[in-house]
Amino acid sequence: MDVAVESRVEPVGRIGVSRKVKAYISLTKPRVVELLLVTTVPTMILAARGIPNLWLVLATVVGGYMSAGSAGAFNCYIDRDIDRVMRRTKNRPLVTGELSDREALVFAWALGVASVLVLGFFTNWLAAGLSVAAILIYVVFYTLILKRRTTQNIVWGGVAGCMPVLIGWAVVTNSVGWAPVILFGVIFLWTPPHYWPLSMKYREDYKDAGVPMLAVVRGRAVVGLQVVLYAWAMVACSLLLIPVARMGVLYTAVALVAGGWFLYESHRLYNLAICHATVSPMRVFHGSIAYLTLIFLAVAIDPLLPF
């Protein structure tokens, strides 16, 4: 995999070991990886209807981090040209020169191969196969094909971010059932209300980089409406887990309350957008993270309760 890019990196002095390590970690997009792992472990607890084997959890977390980190590193390598244009990404290591293109590409491949081996040998090969699929979807389907061509880039590219729940379930059961499919659907429907508000804030960045995000092509009113529609579908999908996975009072209460709160925030964003008032898209962006965290905390705790 090689993408020709005109080099415009400012030369930097000799980089110390600690700074180099931090640059490699940054390449894996730790915040994104952290969010993915937040969905994996609760799914494993639900699949086991209790606390799964801790060594299995550790192997899954390590393998999952490597898998998501590999995808993130490939993404940084492929998108290094537009990262140099956007203010939001100007401090990434390939832009600053802390890492060379070759170092990033070798690191991405090494992490990807290591993730497959860790998941395959220490969990099972179904989980490893799903991990490979996640990397391919994010790198090829999203980064190479969709991102620069369509406003629906993050909708279908977001499939990669849904894979950890399938992987977590497969690790415990060596199969895929309806419960993880519903959780997959929740994350799939959550992705647009999460990322599109971000594109509203950084609209000019995406425009300058030539990335056709919905906020760039259609404007904030359309983004607000789409956020509302996806939010309603997401909340409805989250409620399907109650009968399918026999969820209890805690999950039901969290799904209803957190869902109602996020719907309110989504409608608020839309109403401000159509009234041409000042909007705070990052409020919905951060709210979406809080919502997903609460939902998966409930997924983890609910099976452990005696009622």
UniProtKB/Swiss-Prot annotation:
<keyword id="KW-0812">Transmembrane</keyword>
<dbReference type="Pfam" id="PF01040">
    <property type="entry name" value="UbiA"/>
</dbReference>
<keyword id="KW-0472">Membrane</keyword>
<feature type="transmembrane region" description="Helical">
    <location>
        <begin position="126"/>
        <end position="146"/>
    </location>
</feature>
<keyword id="KW-0808">Transferase</keyword>
<comment type="similarity">
    <text>Belongs to the UbiA prenyltransferase family. Protoheme IX farnesyltransferase subfamily.</text>
</comment>
<dbReference type="InterPro" id="IPR044878">
    <property type="entry name" value="UbiA_sf"/>
</dbReference>
<keyword id="KW-1003">Cell membrane</keyword>
<comment type="pathway">
    <text>Porphyrin-containing compound metabolism; heme O biosynthesis; heme O from protoheme: step 1/1.</text>
</comment>
<dbReference type="GO" id="GO:0005886">
    <property type="term" value="C:plasma membrane"/>
</dbReference>
<feature type="transmembrane region" description="Helical">
    <location>
        <begin position="169"/>
        <end position="189"/>
    </location>
</feature>
<keyword id="KW-0350">Heme biosynthesis</keyword>
<feature type="transmembrane region" description="Helical">
    <location>
        <begin position="54"/>
        <end position="74"/>
    </location>
</feature>
<dbReference type="GO" id="GO:0048034">
    <property type="term" value="P:heme O biosynthetic process"/>
</dbReference>
<keyword id="KW-1133">Transmembrane helix</keyword>
<feature type="transmembrane region" description="Helical">
    <location>
        <begin position="287"/>
        <end position="307"/>
    </location>
</feature>
<comment type="function">
    <text>Converts heme B (protoheme IX) to heme O by substitution of the vinyl group on carbon 2 of heme B porphyrin ring with a hydroxyethyl farnesyl side group.</text>
</comment>
<dbReference type="InterPro" id="IPR006369">
    <property type="entry name" value="Protohaem_IX_farnesylTrfase"/>
</dbReference>
<dbReference type="InterPro" id="IPR000537">
    <property type="entry name" value="UbiA_prenyltransferase"/>
</dbReference>
<feature type="transmembrane region" description="Helical">
    <location>
        <begin position="244"/>
        <end position="264"/>
    </location>
</feature>
<feature type="transmembrane region" description="Helical">
    <location>
        <begin position="222"/>
        <end position="242"/>
    </location>
</feature>
<dbReference type="InterPro" id="IPR030470">
    <property type="entry name" value="UbiA_prenylTrfase_CS"/>
</dbReference>
<feature type="transmembrane region" description="Helical">
    <location>
        <begin position="32"/>
        <end position="52"/>
    </location>
</feature>
<feature type="transmembrane region" description="Helical">
    <location>
        <begin position="105"/>
        <end position="125"/>
    </location>
</feature>
<dbReference type="GO" id="GO:0008495">
    <property type="term" value="F:protoheme IX farnesyltransferase activity"/>
</dbReference>
<protein>
    <recommendedName>
        <fullName>Protoheme IX farnesyltransferase</fullName>
        <ecNumber>2.5.1.141</ecNumber>
    </recommendedName>
</protein>
